[in-house]
C-alpha cells in the first residue's frame, strides 16, 4: 500500500462518481438541476461548486491572483479534517469571510482582508481560517480561497454552479447513469469516473 501511495490517491469522502462541468469553467449550471439530481433515487449525494479563476487580488499591498471557490454544507464538513487554524463556522455562516488554502509561499494570513478585483469592481473578503489541503489544484503562484455560496454570490454576483459532483447509491446501474447523462445539457461536460474509482478501491481494500 505504501508503494501505491505514490501512484494512486485513496478515495476521499468528496470523491465523485459523476461530474457535470460547465463550458469554459464558467458559472452556468442552474441550481434547479442540482435539486433535480438530489431527488433522483439512485443519487446518494449531489453537491455543486462555483468557481472564479485567477481573480486579481491585493492583500497588505501585495498583488496575487486567487481562485475563489464556493462550498456547501457537505464540503465544509469534509474540510474539518483539514483545518489548520481558524474557524470553519465563520466562513460558513458569516457573509464576506473565507478560508485560505495553505501554500509554502503564502502571503495571505488569518485576519487579512483580501481585496478582489471582480470585473473592475473591488470586493473584500476577510480570511478567518487556513486549510492544509483541498480537492483542487490551482495554477502555479495562484492562491485558493474557499467561501460559502452566499459569500461567493455577494462577491461575484454569480448564482449558478461551475461543477456538480454526484455520488451514487450502491445499486445504481449503467442504465441509471445513462438516464442522468440524458438530463445534462449537451453544452456541459459529463464525466463518468466510476471505473477509475473502483480500481482505486480494489487496490486499497
Q: PLM features: what roles do these ranges have?
A:
Residues 2-204:
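Basic-flanked hydrophobic alpha-helices used for secretion and membrane insertion
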